[in-house]
From Swiss-Prot:
It comes from Escherichia coli (strain K12). Pfam families: HTH_6, SIS. Residues 37-56 bind DNA. The gene is hexR. Residues 1-77 form the HTH rpiR-type domain. This is HTH-type transcriptional regulator HexR. SUPFAM superfamilies: Homeodomain-like, SIS domain.
Length: 289
């Protein structure tokens, strides 16, 4: 975990004044490494001793030592792009880094994933009267993918990327409904409120999120993904891939739990979709001509 990621992970545990320092640094880490302690205190509207207390809470000896660690973190990645990519990387270099990072992260998540949580989630999903998938930002795309998969399972499925419709759906939940909320940071206020609304209306809430987050704490069941990617600083890449893969795991578990007869229904759905596609054999014949 680099210094930027460490600051982000500790935000909730900082005092109000120390958090002001953290937010100034996260907003402009490049400026922070060139700032004096007096300038930092002035910008954060705190005292210089507060800046030093913040630095010590980050396991550094003071502001100069903190700036050194911060500079090293910035050298290890390009903010708002990817933690593994540097400004001067060639196309061959950054292409390889992105693929290697994705494969390594998925392998790490595979080994760290709580299989009992997966099993419990499959239990809840297979018993659900209605399933809703919600996310915001990049996680909305993952929720949409989940809707596409579970829509084939002959169970009522709800999806929306509009927060008003999401809130209305959670307010209309009832016993037997399951709401799946997806957020890498687990700190999106709207999603935490959705979890509260759904539970107040007797629904079960499954969260795909990071451990120890407000969303994880509010959910009935949290499937925590250990992905070392700070999406406040970098573009979400591997975290989204991990979420998509876990959705595939849940869909597979759902299918297996429902049994062979249920898979016959999936076969009929696949057959019905064939008419919407060009026939591969006809396309091959056309190519031969």
């Amino acid at each position: 975990m680099n210094m930027l990621e460490k600051i982000q992970s500790q935000l909730e545990h900082l005092s109000k004044s120390e958090r002001k320092v953290a937010e100034v640094i996260l907003a402009s880490p490049d400026n922070a490494i060139h700032s004096s302690i007096a300038a930092m205190a002035l910008e954060a509207n705190v005292s210089e001793p507060t800046v030093n207390r913040f630095c010590r809470s980050m396991d550094t000896r003071g502001f100069p030592d903190f700036k050194l660690h911060l500079a090293q973190s910035l050298a290890n990645g390009t903010p708002y792009v990817n933690r593994n990519v540097n400004e001067d990387d060639s196309v061959e270099s950054y292409t390889g880094k992105i693929f290697e990072s994705a494969m390594a992260t998925l392998d790490h998540v595979r080994h760290s994933l709580d299989k009992s949580a997966i099993n419990r989630a499959v239990d809840l999903l297979t018993q659900a009267k209605k399933i809703a998938f919600f996310g915001l930002g990049s996680s909305a795309a993952v929720a949409h993918d989940a809707m596409n998969k579970f829509f084939r399972f002959n169970v009522p499925v709800v999806y929306s990327d509009d927060i008003v419709l999401q809130r209305m759906s959670c307010m209309n939940c009832s016993d037997g409904d399951v709401v799946v909320l997806i957020s890498h940071t687990g700190r999106t206020k709207n999603l935490v409120e959705l979890a509260q609304l759904a539970r107040e209306n007797d629904a079960m809430v499954i969260a795909l999120t990071s451990a120890g987050t407000p969303l994880a704490r509010e959910a009935t069941l949290a499937i925590t993904l250990d992905v070392p990617e700070d999406t406040d600083i970098y573009m979400p890449m591997v975290s989204r891939l991990a979420q998509l893969t876990v959705i595939d795991v849940l869909a597979t578990g759902f299918t297996l739990r429902r049994g062979a007869k249920f898979r016959d229904n999936l076969k009929r759905v696949k057959e019905a979709l064939k008419e919407s596609r060009f026939d591969k054999q006809l396309l091959n014949l056309s190519d031969d001509r």
